[in-house]
């Protein structure tokens, strides 16, 4: 069994780049996925609530706190429920409300474990990773036999590039409570360490651990499907996404995950329709961005540009509500060749706060798009230091080699990206194919 033995992650310390929301959610299973989304391995404090159930809980708690403003448990739970509402709706205005409730709870009871964990979760959500690390350590002191605080601490350490320490935190987490959340982190660690078969095994365990939890099952199915998709197995990926939608109709992360599968099959109109459904439900920037790429591929440049404008608005709103999205914004700008000099500056700022492999690759990509390819090469090498098999990382490296005039090396990296998944990106897989040919 995996539950009591050491986590076997070949070749590197484990890395799990996730935002730990105590209310559940989804784990971003690719380093290039946008953590501005409400993305996390579920740590299920308010498990089992439907979106309507969470809204009702918020209303009841608000009334309760009006009657008794000193109710610490209700304040902390309200803060967590506001975070849940953000996850369910994509409306980042819930996050200042969460912060207000949790700060009030903390002022009344500085050593309350649930409040401290909630503040740590919120810090991760806002990409305040240094603060999240401190809060995670404090949460462990307050509740040393609870697994959740180790998730907060580990997630923060990972984003700070502290891989051995993060691995130790997650080892403790899985030792204390082997469950969906722990297994998901094992899976992601193995994925980023280049062990996709091991990642699939661990995510299957997460799926098996989700029995009785509809959202947990849908979430795990999508993550498992994405692992199959990463290695080019579209049939298995589609089966798992369809399973998620059967259990949880309209599940937006399954709708979005189906999009590249349908696009790869040549069903571009269906892919656009699926992404529009996801965007209409929760307008996350990565959903809108992919919709724009689909429109561009379909020969509809006006609609593609409209999505770019929408992404800018969403990113502005996220920043206004306290989420640091420098890296996500830099990735998007670099992808679309928007203001190369400004994008490099933004990538440097994001990397300083978040020196993970995602930060390394983002900086490398921004530098490459700005023509500073010698410096980009160094950061690309650093981004690949864990042995991660990621087609976008490979594509970025190929572009850098091409920029430096290393034609043979560039073709090798493009071929590696396509060998892993010939349809790794709606936008860039065709570019890689042309470069190889």
Which residues does each predicted region cover?
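N-terminal leader/linker segments that initiate helical-solenoid repeat arrays
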Residues: 3-108, 113-114, 134, 422-423, ...
């Amino acid at each position: 069994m995996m539950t009591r033995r050491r986590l076997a992650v070949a070749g590197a310390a484990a890395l799990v780049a996730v935002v730990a929301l105590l209310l559940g959610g989804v784990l971003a299973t690719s380093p290039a996925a946008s953590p501005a989304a409400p993305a996390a391995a579920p740590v299920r404090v308010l498990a089992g609530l439907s979106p309507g159930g969470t809204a009702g809980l918020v209303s009841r708690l608000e009334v309760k706190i009006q009657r008794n403003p000193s109710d610490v448990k209700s304040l902390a739970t309200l803060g967590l429920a506001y975070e849940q509402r953000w996850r369910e709706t994509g409306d980042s205005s819930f996050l200042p409300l969460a912060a207000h409730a949790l700060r009030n709870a903390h002022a009344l009871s500085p050593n309350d474990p649930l409040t401290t964990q909630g503040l740590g979760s919120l810090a991760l959500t806002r990409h305040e990773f240094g603060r999240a690390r401190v809060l995670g350590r404090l949460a462990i002191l307050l509740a040393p036999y609870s697994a959740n605080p180790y998730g907060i601490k580990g997630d923060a350490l990972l984003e700070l590039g502290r891989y051995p320490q993060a691995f130790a935190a997650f080892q403790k987490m899985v030792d204390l409570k082997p469950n969906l959340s722990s297994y998901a982190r094992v899976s992601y660690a193995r994925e980023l360490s280049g062990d996709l078969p091991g990642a699939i095994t661990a995510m299957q365990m997460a799926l098996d651990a989700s029995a009785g939890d509809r959202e947990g099952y849908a979430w795990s199915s999508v993550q498992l499907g994405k692992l199959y998709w990463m290695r080019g197995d579209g049939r298995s990926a589609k089966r798992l996404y369809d399973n998620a939608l059967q259990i949880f109709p309209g599940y937006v992360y399954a709708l979005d995950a189906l999009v590249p599968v349908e696009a790869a099959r040549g069903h571009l109109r269906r892919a656009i329709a699926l992404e529009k459904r996801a965007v209409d439900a929760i307008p996350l920037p990565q959903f809108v961005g992919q919709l724009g790429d689909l429109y561009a591929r379909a020969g509809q440049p006006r609609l593609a540009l409209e999505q770019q404008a929408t992404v800018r608005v969403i990113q502005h709103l996220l920043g206004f509500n306290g989420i640091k999205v420098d890296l996500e914004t830099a990735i998007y700008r670099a992808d679309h060749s928007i203001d190369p000099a400004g994008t490099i500056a933004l990538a440097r700022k994001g990397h300083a706060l978040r020196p993970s492999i995602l930060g390394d690759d983002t900086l490398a990509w921004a530098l490459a798009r700005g023509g500073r390819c010698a410096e980009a090469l160094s950061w690309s090498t650093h981004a690949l230091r864990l042995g991660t098999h990621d087609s976008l990382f490979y594509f970025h490296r190929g572009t850098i080699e091409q920029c430096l005039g290393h034609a043979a090396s560039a073709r090798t990296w493009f071929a590696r990206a396509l060998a892993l998944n010939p349809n790794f990106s709606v936008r860039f897989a065709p570019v890689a194919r042309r470069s190889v040919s």
